Regions:
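Short alpha-helical elements
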Residues: 1-189
Length: 189
């Protein structure tokens, strides 16, 4: 499914008048609450006050999945930057040079891990005078992608025994999400 997501992402980018490989990515993570089946590998996310698994994802600027990595929820976001950056460059043919991230990816180690793979991290911060909900530039794209994935029942919680199964289901969900857009793009051409 990973190869299908890669091919569909390239086709959708070309249909949108963009280059086949993105030059920027957006990184974020979301915590999925564990179930008794997945409980053995679950960790506790203190920020979300939830026990489960954390899905670290990278999407392009259109919201299409580049790569993802599943860890226990107790893992810090900044510790996953190196692995995500390597997978991003593999998926994008070494063309991504900039990644938009939230406050969870701050720190010298995270920036150095990304730079080892040729990616500069740009932290998108909340405005000083924040009142209520604020739409952050660039960051809303990855949140929308998580919203798309959460519509699939198997991805609303972590029901899986193995992390690679959970990752595979995310790739499958994005294939299902991209296919209708491909048919729309092909009917225009």
């Amino acid at each position: 499914f990973e190869a299908m997501v890669h091919d569909l992402r390239m086709l959708l980018r070309l249909a949108d008048g963009r280059t086949p490989h993105p030059s920027a990515a957006i990184l974020d993570s979301r915590t999925l609450q564990s179930t008794p089946t997945s409980g053995g590998r679950a960790g506790y996310d203190g920020a979300k006050r939830r026990k489960g698994s954390k899905v670290h994802a990278a999407v392009d600027t259109l919201g299409h999945l580049l790569t993802l990595h599943v860890t226990p929820a107790s893992e810090q976001d900044r510790d996953q930057v190196g692995q995500l950056a390597e997978a991003i460059q593999e998926a994008s043919n070494q063309e991504v040079t900039l990644a938009y991230v939230d406050q969870g990816y701050t720190g010298q180690r995270a920036a150095e891990a990304a730079l080892e793979h040729g990616i500069t991290l740009e932290v998108v911060k909340l405005p000083e005078a924040k009142r209520g909900f604020v739409l952050l530039p660039r960051r809303w794209v990855v949140e929308r992608s998580f919203g798309w994935a959460a519509r699939f029942r198997r991805l609303a919680r972590d029901y899986e025994r193995l992390p690679k199964t959970l990752a595979g289901l995310h790739y499958l969900a994005f294939v299902c999400l991209m296919l209708p857009h491909i048919s729309d793009a092909m009917s225009i051409v």
